[in-house]
Amino acid sequence: LYNTIPRCVMDGGTGRSSALVFSGVDDEEFRLLKNDDTNPERRFVRNMSNNSICADTPEDYAKIAKILPPLIKEAGEPGVFNRFLARCGMSRHADPRLKRVRGTNACSEVLLEGWEFCNLASAILQRCMNPDGTIDYNKLRNACMLAAFYTAIVACNPLNEARAEAVRAENLRVAVSLDASFVGYETLSNQEFGTLLKSCKELIITYVDAYTMAIAGKKSVTHTCFKPGGKIPPLADSLSSINGPICSQYVELRRII
């Protein structure tokens, strides 16, 4: 299944897909799936997914922090998904809907419930530059507005799967990512770059909430994320990404808009 999906997805002329698989803290077999000495027969299939261990309590995280470093040094994985912090949110007034988070998309940018689709658009900072190498703030603003508008429409569209539709209608989950944000770090001072990120976040939240309220009468559970890197597609300033859940696993399908 996972080998077939990339043939159906095009990103800048290249087939692309990714999958993220989770396990609990005490699953020793899972930890060693990408170890060549333990599982040599998996050498040619181990890159079909990214593997991460879920930490549901501070104690889980403390345990993982002691176990994983030598495994990561050897095979680069498994990673860690701190589900405890994901459910707490970033403020004292975190949306209570976050308590239902079970997983993420394949890059772990967007928190997801079971059977929830990830709806992500990326504004590419490096595509919002003036000829002299400075940031074109009007173009960046327009990119954020367009990404917010596009994802809000997608979030409010009904789905053809009852379980996914129930979660979509409750959350209207939207994610707008500012990709290639390393450009701002290299171009601006730390204070200027911090101000830029805060301004983009506030802009995206304002427009996403305005659009989803106008369309569906409800605010989105999530809004933004930022990436230090980011692939730059040759044909567009933003990407759309829709993740379809298959049981407890999530498959990312990314395409150009």
Q: Across the structure, where does each feature detected by a protein language model lie?
A:
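Catalytic or ion-translocation cores adjacent to nucleophile or general acid/base/metal-coordination motifs
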Residues: 1, 238-257
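Alpha/propeptide regions of enzymes that mature by internal proteolysis
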Residues: 1-8, 56-71, 78, 145, ...
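Short, well-ordered loop/turn elements at secondary-structure boundaries
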Residues: 4, 14-16, 49, 62-68, ...
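Internal maturation/activation junctions in enzymes
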Residues: 13-59, 155-162, 180-229
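Function-dense linear segments that define catalytic or interfacial modules
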Residues: 71-188, 254-256
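Secondary-structure capping and boundary motifs in well-ordered enzyme cores
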Residues: 109-117, 143, 166-177, 196-207, ...
